[in-house]
Amino acid sequence: MLPRPKAPASPRRPQTPTPSEQDADPGPASPRDTEAQRLRFRQFQYHVASGPHLALGQLWTLCRQWLRPEARSKEQMLELLVLEQFLGALPSKMRTWVQSQGPRSCREAASLVEDLTQMCQQEVLVSLDSVEPQDWSFGEEEDGKSPRSQKEPSQASELILDAVAAAPALPEESEWLETTQLQQSLHTRAEAEAPRAPGLLGSRARLPLKPSIWDEPEDLLAGPSSDLRAEGTVISSPKGPSAQRISPRRRNRNTDQSGRHQPSLKHTKGGTQEAVAGISVVPRGPRGGRPFQCADCGMVFTWVTHFIEHQKTHREEGPFPCPECGKVFLHNSVLTEHGKIHLLEPPRKKAPRSKGPRESVPPRDGAQGPVAPRSPKRPFQCSVCGKAFPWMVHLIDHQKLHTAHGHM
């Protein structure tokens, strides 16, 4: 009988590696890789996965990549967890510095924290030696010990942390001090140049710029350019119809400390003017008053634009006779004001009419009486009877008589 052939020996281990063998890393992991794997595990978010089971699978994989149970013992994995908790309990700035050194164990992390504390303490002691004693002593002590020697360990650690936290803020404080000094110097320079402001305003007033309608009257006034008169004097021209008086209250406001009145600006023909041509400004009163007054006719204006338009009428000089009364005026604006007197003159009183059947009837054609000739003083003439009247209202009342009797 032939011997039975032996079956081929099956492999002791499968050809495909297990998941644990896939994740295993024969070489030791560097601190940077361990920290990166820890962050991926701690910062995992649920919405990245498509479901709860997939999220648990990813967390399981990330945790194995971080702790590596196939390459580390239980004590090593516990040390990683304790190291993470220890670093999380440190202050933020100290934790950042210790993590940058890459400690592999809790003892290394504790040594780094101790070294950092000693370095900061030495820096604080050096800074305390440079400070004057009176800044730290609040009184004379009998034992003669310095305040630094009486500090407890907890207070020293607080000083160390304060020094570490205040270190990056020093450049910002120095920049702030430089900015403050610059602002103070600019403010001092502005105060020194303040007396030159009136001169600048005066030179600006000579420019032929049209002022804005939004400017307030008080903003357009120049301090020394106001026309100040004595108490009870009239601010108007000899021929002007309007006049205003300055009250003693306003007069006292415009006197200087020595009690003298400031000189007024006068309008000169063809010459250089210190302010607007022909301006005589009333002393500044309460808000909403009329500060602009014409020196030629005495008219007062609230806005400078109206005042400038009024000044144009004074440039046309010459004899202007009144067509009504024959008076002659030097300026056209004065003639315009004078003409209002004739236009607003009240009409003459009419004789009372007799109410009754025997009302006066105008004469018929061929029996008219003498008709008053038309003259410049009687420009309004009736087209029915030929009578002339000096006022339009008289002619209208006269024409009502013809209308009542059917002659029109």
From Swiss-Prot:
List the record's Gene Ontology CC terms alphabetically: chromatin; nucleus
Q: Region Disordered: which residues?
A: 1-34, 136-155, 177-203, 215-273, 344-379
Molecular functions (GO terms): DNA-binding transcription factor activity, RNA polymerase II-specific; RNA polymerase II cis-regulatory region sequence-specific DNA binding; sequence-specific double-stranded DNA binding; zinc ion binding
Q: Where in or outside the cell? A: Nucleus
* Keywords, ordered alphabetically: DNA-binding, Metal-binding, Nucleus, Repeat, Transcription, Transcription regulation, Zinc, Zinc-finger
GO terms, biological process? regulation of transcription by RNA polymerase II
What InterPro entries does the annotation carry?
Answer: SCAN-C2H2_zinc_finger, SCAN_dom, SCAN_sf, Znf_C2H2_sf, Znf_C2H2_type
Output the superkingdom of the source species.
Answer: Eukaryota
Q: Where are the zinc fingers (C2H2-type)?
A: 292-314, 320-342, 380-402
Q: Where, by residue number, does the polypeptide cross the bilayer?
A: none
Asked whether the keyword Transmembrane is assigned, the reply is: no
Under the heading Pfam families, the entry gives: SCAN (PF02023), zf-C2H2 (PF00096)
Keyword Protein transport assigned: no
- Renumbered to this chain, the Polar residues biased-composition regions fall at 177-187
Q: Where do the SCAN box domain residues begin and end?
A: 38-120
So what does this one do? Answer: May be involved in transcriptional regulation.
| Protein name as annotated | Zinc finger and SCAN domain-containing protein 1
Whichever gene encodes this chain, its name is: ZSCAN1
